[in-house]
Regions:
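Structural/interface elements that position substrates and couple domains in central-metabolism enzymes
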Residues: 1-437
Length: 437
């Protein structure tokens, strides 16, 4: 089977590489010539555990190829996946220009039946627009070539994307013809053989499923942060509350961790897009709006705690940050809580010493040299008046606190992910604050 993946960002590159791993011949397409040249040389543009080795293995095996020309692929492929970006527009809606450009290119150049599958996260109704764009280009050519559209949303977690793709909880596929269903069944057969669920449905339902999943996950995060903030006010311990409610089989423990807010390429963007989709259809998503509001407030909570510790006087203070990426296992800083915190610290006259195991280069690209980039987590703590944990990387979980205390100017720790034993740190002489207790 031959397929093309348009877009070599996070979703496209992982998707193409994992399909190649199952024996499919995959061509990854991107208009960015520098990115394609780097990929052809084995230089991977994103940090994702296991991806580089898998790319190199499949390139060597002759199953994975890279090009800037979608037109050159269309004679040979059975399926084209569109995995291009859908950035938020000024009004919060998803910008579909790249998705529709791909559709137009396919319509202008296809010579045989092609199944066009949208992998990007897109609003309900996008498949209809893709179909119309392809049909319009075919009409311009005076051609009546058969084609199908489908929706196959991704459910990958950054930092665990390879395992998520190769061992999925489920695969959601929206189709509108038996021919398209047979092709997608054939493509996903290696996964079906080991009893993974492939759920076929209509296309609008598949498009909505992705948004609904992210809505639910974002809601659980904001719900727990809301509860955590109230716990602090009434003297309850959010960790105990989490254990109490998470033990209920109807609720479960996943995505019930309080912290300093969610970020990344999906939740913030998709929440805004779903709110906008509802507005365009005359409906107001009241719960989802609250989810967004809670999260925006939560990103500032560590700064508020720091202000209280120093009685409002932060000017000249040195603050160490552990973690810059929006979550462990990635270098992605899109909508990261650390960005909000750094901006507030700099505005208050603080000196910032930051360390992240993967996101240092990305941070330099985003905010330049406005902070000191430490060599390791201990260097970050040197002469610091306060240490703030923002991202719960594994290497931050068991630091040598005696060394940290000696390095710091003042032993103040703000735990933005509730991973430390506050009683232990307080016994050692630290001032310790966390979320929700």
């Amino acid at each position: 089977m031959n397929i093309a993946i348009v877009g070599t960002g996070y979703v496209g590159l992982v998707t193409g590489t994992c399909f190649a791993e199952t024996g499919v011949d995959v061509t990854c397409v991107d208009v960015n010539a520098d990115k394609i040249a780097n990929l052809q040389q084995g230089i991977i543009p994103i940090y994702e555990p296991g991806l580089e080795d898998m790319v190199l293995r499949n390139v060597k095996a002759g199953r994975l190829h890279f090009t800037t020309s979608l037109e050159s692929c269309l004679d040979n492929v059975d399926i084209v996946f569109s995995a291009v970006g859908t950035p938020p527009d000024e009004d919060g809606s998803a910008d579909l220009r790249y998705v529709l450009e791909v559709a137009k290119t396919i319509g202008a150049n296809m010579k045989k039946y092609t199944l066009v599958v949208t992998k990007s996260t897109v609003p309900v109704g996008t498949a209809r627009k893709v179909k119309a764009a392809i049909r319009e280009e075919l009409e311009k050519r005076g051609e009546s070539i058969d084609f199908d559209v489908a929706s196959n949303p991704e459910f990958l977690k950054e930092g665990n994307a390879i395992d998520d793709f190769m061992s999925p909880d489920r695969v959601v596929v929206g189709v509108e013809s038996e021919r398209a269903k047979k092709l997608m069944t054939k493509l996903y057969k290696p996964f079906m053989l080991v009893n993974f669920r492939v759920i076929f449905m209509d296309i609008p339902s598949a498009e909505m499923t992705k948004y609904a999943a992210n809505y639910m996950l974002a809601t659980r995060i904001s719900f727990m942060n809301d509860i955590a903030n109230l716990c602090e006010l009434v003297g309850a311990d959010v960790n105990m509350v989490r254990d109490g409610i998470g033990s209920d089989s109807r609720i479960g423990r996943k995505f019930l961790y309080p912290g300093c807010g969610y970020g990344g390429s999906c939740f913030p963007k998709d929440v805004k897009a779903l709110i906008k989709t509802a507005e365009q259809n005359g409906y107001s998503m009241q719960v989802l709006k609250a989810v967004e509001d809670v999260n925006e407030n939560q990103k500032g909570i560590l700064f508020e705690k720091l202000v209280k510790v120093f009685n409002g006087d932060l000017k000249g203070k040195t603050v160490a940050l552990w973690g810059l990426a929006f979550k462990p296992g990635t270098d992605d800083m899109r909508e990261a809580p650390a960005l909000v915190l750094i901006e507030k610290l700099k505005q208050s006259g603080c000196n910032v010493r930051a360390y992240d195991p993967a996101a240092m280069d990305e941070s330099r690209r985003r905010i330049g040299e406005s902070v000191y980039y430490a060599h390791d987590m201990y260097d970050a703590a040197l002469d610091a008046d306060a240490l703030i944990l923002v991202t719960e990387w594994k290497e931050f979980r068991l630091p040598t606190w005696g060394v940290i205390k000696k390095a710091m100017k003042q032993p103040v720790v703000l735990d933005g992910r509730n991973i430390y034993d506050g009683d232990e740190l307080q016994e050692m002489g630290f001032v310790y604050h966390c979320i929700g207790r």
